[in-house]
């Protein structure tokens, strides 16, 4: 299964309130009708980011996550009426200027076991019908000489024992592209902006601060630095909306 990530910032011609009203009341309703979609979740950046991130503003305002069987299925969707309706709604409200085009990534994920895992599966089986947990997303560009995958395979087990970590996912960004109609290529420009995606889930931003002040957190960041990798980090409030196809998963409160 492939996960598609959309990064959505608030364009200059909309206020935050206007963007949220459109996105939550109109766009997500259209998105639920897209052909072949397996799961759909939306996430919103927290105003208070972890201390080690050291950014005045979050990297992006929202990240939408949508799962399909493969990239070809995504292409079929966005050349169908439902996908074109979603795309058209986005273009007509966000615009098509270069500073408002979303980052789009096709991600193949591997989940690692953690020492303090949540007691339910977050992407299959049962799930909660409300927002919960904080997801720290790390977006990585790889130097040509960096063998991050080999290093990460060795480091993952120690990282998974980080204090307060509830879920740990490592994603490789696919180099595949897709065409929409005759003129649009995804990812925009035909090349993804990032090469890897790390997801580390915690109970709160404060839990993230404690984890990255620990030995494991410092060792992890130092290891990335030695490889010449400087991730872009953003902490998100997870799953304000979660929709699954087919709808055969029991809803828990």
Name what the model sees in each region.
Residues 1-253:
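Macromolecular interaction modules
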